């Protein structure tokens, strides 16, 4: 197996301008639509990664505090979930011994989450927005000959890319090769 490499950035003309051919997928043939999306994800992965990074950076630039705080709240909430799951008996004892302190802690966390909701929305949109645009582009973009050749090289294992590995992990390697 060869080493994993990020493919080159595709020209803007190939990606969205001039020679880019766009067409709505046929909703009656979901398998073909899936093949188109997977093959475009493989071929334009560097362009998509750049678009995702720009979207995340833009959201971080526009509302940096909310983006950072929402990431912190998500991390803390997950940490609390893991902690409570591992130490359920201790949480139960604490709740019985100090009900007022537990109630105050729950209210404080709730208040923090409510205060950060704007940031959480910013964080979600900074991820969901670029991902949605990527999937729309991958659905609408028709494949060209160069795209098909690159995807065949990837499918027979001569060239490994991060998106190819991700698709394999998701069980889509047979889809990508067709």
UniProtKB/Swiss-Prot annotation:
Please indicate if the UniProt record lists Transmembrane helix as a keyword.
yes
Which ranges does the record list as Cytoplasmic topological domains? 1-41, 86-96, 141-178
Membrane topology of the entry: Multi-pass membrane protein
Q: Which GO terms describe its cellular component?
A: endosome membrane
Checking Pfam families in the record gives: PRA1
Q: Which residues lie on this side of the membrane: Extracellular?
A: 63-64, 120-122
State the PANTHER family in the record. Answer: PRA1 FAMILY PROTEIN 2, PRA1 PROTEIN
Family to which the UniProt record says this protein belongs: Belongs to the PRA1 family.
Listed under subunit, the entry gives:
Interacts with CCR5 and GDE1.
> What is the documented function of this protein?
May be involved in ER/Golgi transport and vesicular traffic. Plays a proapoptotic role in cerulenin-induced neuroblastoma apoptosis.
Q: What is this protein called?
A: PRA1 family protein 2
In its UniProt entry, the species of origin is given as Macaca fascicularis
């Amino acid at each position: 197996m060869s080493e994993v490499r990020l493919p080159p950035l595709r020209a803007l003309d190939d990606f969205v301008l001039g020679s880019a051919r766009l067409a709505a997928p046929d909703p009656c043939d979901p398998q073909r639509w899936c093949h188109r999306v997977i093959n475009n994800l493989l071929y334009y992965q560097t362009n998509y990664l750049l678009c995702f990074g720009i979207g995340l950076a833009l959201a971080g630039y526009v509302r940096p505090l909310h983006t950072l705080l929402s990431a912190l709240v998500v991390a803390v909430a997950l940490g609390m979930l893991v902690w409570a799951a591992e130490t359920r008996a201790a949480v139960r004892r604490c709740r019985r011994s100090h009900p007022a302190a537990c109630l105050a802690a729950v209210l404080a966390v709730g208040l923090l989450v409510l205060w950060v909701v704007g940031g959480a929305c910013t964080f979600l949109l900074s991820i969901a927005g670029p991902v949605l645009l990527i999937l729309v582009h991958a659905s609408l973009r028709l494949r060209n000959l160069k795209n098909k050749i690159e995807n065949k090289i990837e499918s027979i294992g001569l060239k490994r890319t991060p998106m190819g590995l991700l698709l394999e992990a998701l069980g889509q390697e047979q889809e990508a090769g067709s």
